Amino acid sequence: MYDHFNSPSIDILYDYGPFLKKCEMTGGIGSYSAGTPTPRVAIVGAGISGLVAATELLRAGVKDVVLYESRDRIGGRVWSQVFDQTRPRYIAEMGAMRFPPSATGLFHYLKKFGISTSTTFPDPGVVDTELHYRGKRYHWPAGKKPPELFRRVYEGWQSLLSEGYLLEGGSLVAPLDITAMLKSGRLEEAAIAWQGWLNVFRDCSFYNAIVCIFTGRHPPGGDRWARPEDFELFGSLGIGSGGFLPVFQAGFTEILRMVINGYQSDQRLIPDGISSLAARLADQSFDGKALRDRVCFSRVGRISREAEKIIIQTEAGEQRVFDRVIVTSSNRAMQMIHCLTDSESFLSRDVARAVRETHLTGSSKLFILTRTKFWIKNKLPTTIQSDGLVRGVYCLDYQPDEPEGHGVVLLSYTWEDDAQKMLAMPDKKTRCQVLVDDLAAIHPTFASYLLPVDGDYERYVLHHDWLTDPHSAGAFKLNYPGEDVYSQRLFFQPMTANSPNKDTGLYLAGCSCSFAGGWIEGAVQTALNSACAVLRSTGGQLSKGNPLDCINASYRY
């Protein structure tokens, strides 16, 4: 379940898994020599990034670490919400819910705490799936090719991934071949191949790129796609984890890197909920004090400088002074609440622009706890992908050893424009009933089972809109065309610790400051970058193979 394989990420040509494995055996990411004073460190945000950074700093010998959290819980956008405290096994993953093993930094911590990832996430085509398209239902058996109507776009996309793209006067290496290069350690070849894709498509949206690729002279798979029909079909089918029509305006290279990094393959579900990782991190004890007891549940306002010190001011009026600060809050909070982009006190103009302009998606979810696992008993699809209002429907079995247990149905998972539609229905009962009616128009039998336990909509229907979440103002980073350079600036910001003349003592972290927005791996990677930056800039010694010494900006975005 946890077997490690080499899985460097394409944009950084580095794998955090081996470094973490070595550090686990040697004691930490670094250390301080006897007599070297250790810094006082504030971490803004007690999500996975903040908790990982705190863990590694405390293991390395930093004594004074304070985490600030504006919510009333730890975890941030990692949020396994329980329907009912009397039924704690039934959860709604409001944030991250799919976990690919190629996320080796994340899987290191899952293994460390013995958190099971044995269950496959019910992605389309992995389980029995139904595609609802233009008022008709199409059955897609588990492990088989999709229905004939979708065959051309499916095979075309698969051919692009496995064969690459033939240009006039040249070709681009198959994305899956780039993945193989990464896994086999042929990093220079992988970098050259990825730069080729960047050179051609860095300024193209996902939609513009696939139109160029599949209507040109050399379409992968051999068949040109028809406009607009095949592109509408592809938007509903997606690339492995559901329909991508709502993100057609995202950057093509942003989507392609997910495939190359393996994030769309073998996605796992965590039966105990991903919040169990946040809880296990917080339960660790250092010097007789639990990590969770270092969390101050208070919202940080402005972050400012006074000589060589950094001032944290909470909205309750408290001020505290620190030597180093790691900020893991959302990019919107960095700009509007912490005021980090107001001057060059902490961030260069280039980095400040990246903070301000990086695109965050809107996303909404609605879950129902049903009386039974009706899809199993009645041989109904486990997953539905629809061109209607519901978009993605996923049936989740959190107690497979109990046939008579309840079911959890993610009735609606939407992105961007589709998520914005949900904002017009803030009342969850109304929203739920509208979604059920939408589904009933095509599959009335399935829809008839979508009633919460005991008819209790208040308790057994859970929903969340990330766009209006005051702590996030968006779900996750998803670059628009031309914005990959923003991810580069944000990811490498902690590397200023290598240059004393550029180092301000404040470091950015979180998945929106990575090349893996929306994936916990990005949160883990940037947490480690920032923790290493604290050690390096305050007289600590980093372990060999650390990211500050091994990762370089390798691409022209």
Curated annotation (Swiss-Prot):
Transmembrane segments: none annotated. Gene3D superfamilies: 1.10.405.40, 3.90.660.10, FAD/NAD(P)-binding domain. Binds 1 FMN per subunit. Its cofactor is FMN. It catalyses: L-tryptophan + O2 = indole-3-acetamide + CO2 + H2O. Substrate binds at R98. Pathway: Plant hormone metabolism; auxin biosynthesis. Monomer. PANTHER family: AMINE OXIDASE (PTHR10742:SF342), FLAVIN MONOAMINE OXIDASE (PTHR10742). This is Tryptophan 2-monooxygenase. It comes from Pseudomonas savastanoi (Pseudomonas syringae pv. savastanoi). The lineage of its organism: Bacteria, Pseudomonadati, Pseudomonadota, Gammaproteobacteria, Pseudomonadales.
